[in-house]
Amino acid sequence: MVDTMRAALDDGTGQYVVRDVPMPTEFNGSVLLRVRQAGICGSDLHMTKLRNEGEALPSGHEVAGEIVELPSGDYDDYGLNVGDRVAIEGIGGGRACTKCRFCQYGQWKHCMDLAPETGGGFAQYMTRRAAGLFKLPDSLDWVDGAIVEPMAVSVHGLHYGRMHPDDVVGVVGSATIGLSSIAAAKAFGARIVIASARYPQQAEAARKMGADIVVGTGPGEFEDACMQASSGVGADFVVESVGGHQSDSFHQAVRATRNQGTMLYLGGVKIPMKFDLFEPLIREIRIQSAICYGVLDGRHDYEVAIDLLASGDIPYREIVTHQVDLENIQDGFDAAWDKSSGSIKVQVNV
């Protein structure tokens, strides 16, 4: 085995430099993986604006790859073998101790004894534990494998937030997570899905994912559409999928939710914001936060996401508008930022 690999690292200015780095560190129970595909997430974009020094380890968490080496031990429970193609859950399960209070019921994201971070998917190799590796069926290729992660985020949010069949569902934003939320909501039986979209390519994709009503992002457009679709009541379940360095989407989602409905806070607003907590109190709105994935109702969200993608009923891979090689990853980040390029999801071929 070689001692070095190619990896892309933010130099601290938001520019990615591809260079030789040491192979990822092994740890107790770690599996060596050859990365094949990695998606550029909105959080990857936002982090380029927040860093003031270069990365020590590669990032990238929307990842699919191939098992190169398994550590000694019994892996029958996982059904894994060298050469298997897997979607890699690297945030929780891939580092989880599997023994603590949270791991005992499959909430690996909240593990109290996570293994050290050894680097993400913007590199040729990764190390993660077997609990975070999910085999891909033959019908899914590497492109599909690297969109399992964002689909699992929405699966987790809708399950954890307790969306019900026949709900009127609103989705604020039609970027990657908004689009997976639209698709998952329809798959889980939503009666009507209303979505907002900022860019033409997002609006088109929202319709392909199953949105019944797609509106722009002008003041009141989304809220009005949710009211009209629900006979003036408001949506039963609203997903805030935007987050980032703004808070308008959070306020929109609350306003569009009916009394005693649920607002799923999925996007992650990264700035301080003012919010009147009296409104959800008086209206008895449940604001439910959700992040990442875990085991719910006996199945991991990655497993459900893989089944949805393998069903052939959801054209989610069509959100992948651009692909670049690892050596040209900066071109991928540039395209992801520039929505005039038609970009939705940019993936890196590793």
Predicted regions and their residues:
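C-terminal capping/lid region of NAD(P)-dependent oxidoreductase domains
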Residues: V2-D3, G216, G232, G268-V269, ...
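Glycine-rich beta-strand-centered segment in the early N-terminal region that forms part
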Residues: P24-A38, L50-K99, P137-S139
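Mid-domain Rossmann-like dinucleotide-binding core that forms the NAD(H)/NADP(H) cofactor-binding site
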Residues: L140-P219, D224
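Glycine-rich cofactor phosphate-binding loops and adjacent beta1-alpha1 units
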Residues: G161, E204, K208-R286
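C-terminal substrate-binding/catalytic core of Rossmann-like NAD(P)-dependent dehydrogenases/reductases
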Residues: I271-H322, Q330-D331
